[in-house]
Amino acid sequence: MRKTILCIIAVGALCVYGGENAWSGKKVAYLGDSITDARHIGCTSNYWNFLEAKLGIVPLVYGINGHQMKHLVGQAEKLKAEHPDDVDAIFVFAGTNDYNANTPLGSWYEETTETVNRNGTQVALKCRNFVYGEATFRGRINNLMKVLRESFPAQPIYLLTPIHRGYATFGASNVQPDESYANEIGEYIDAYVDVIKEAGNVWAATVIDINAESGLFPLFASHARFFNNAQTDMLHPNNAGHERIAEAIAVRLRSSVCP
């Protein structure tokens, strides 16, 4: 019996075509924390340096050491002031400091009942509205995404999940256990990773799951080769760790829709 196989190919403006890299020369803004900071915390080259080398991306770096998601609103506003019309894509790479700061997860929406015209008749329907604010992690993401969506309606936004957390000590009053431990409100880092994944659907943004796809796992000593210091800092990737992050991103960008 002869079998017929139907192949359906979706043709779009993918970012690698004809052997040419369509990301070359594109300006990409990077919002985030120490892993994005241009001062190179724990490394001499960040993931965005490697993306520049691999794909020819022009980096616009706004990440600041220690910043939580609530601080990225200020980074986004600075981006808007400095590059109102010439940024091609935006990366958001944060959340690990929100976990460390014991930030409650919160809710995306608050729900009410409102009367509205439906098919010519006034009916009472449930209605949801975004919860904004700095008190919760979801509220902080809503704050940030509102600014980004209103300021950059045409630019793709990429949400990166935090990498796994290893042990780190930066002094007697700044000792951070590894991710085997919940924070002081009982939440593991996984919960913050999951919220960022949810945000992709809530805000129509592309999620790149660096937590999974980078392969970085600082809970094991064998992964010390990818981190700043085996004894004192298994939190910040070194150059080798950043290159793995960059490659995980590059794999996704090579097959994504062009900015």
Segments predicted by a language model, with ranges:
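Serine-esterase "nucleophile elbow" of acetyl-processing enzymes
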Residues: 18-65, 76-85, 90, 221-222
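Acidic/histidine-rich helix-loop elements
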Residues: 38-42, 61-70, 108-116, 234
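Active-site neighborhood of divalent metal-dependent phosphoester/pyrophosphate hydrolases
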Residues: 30-33, 68, 97-102
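Alpha-helical transmembrane segments and their juxtamembrane interfaces
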Residues: 12-13, 43, 166
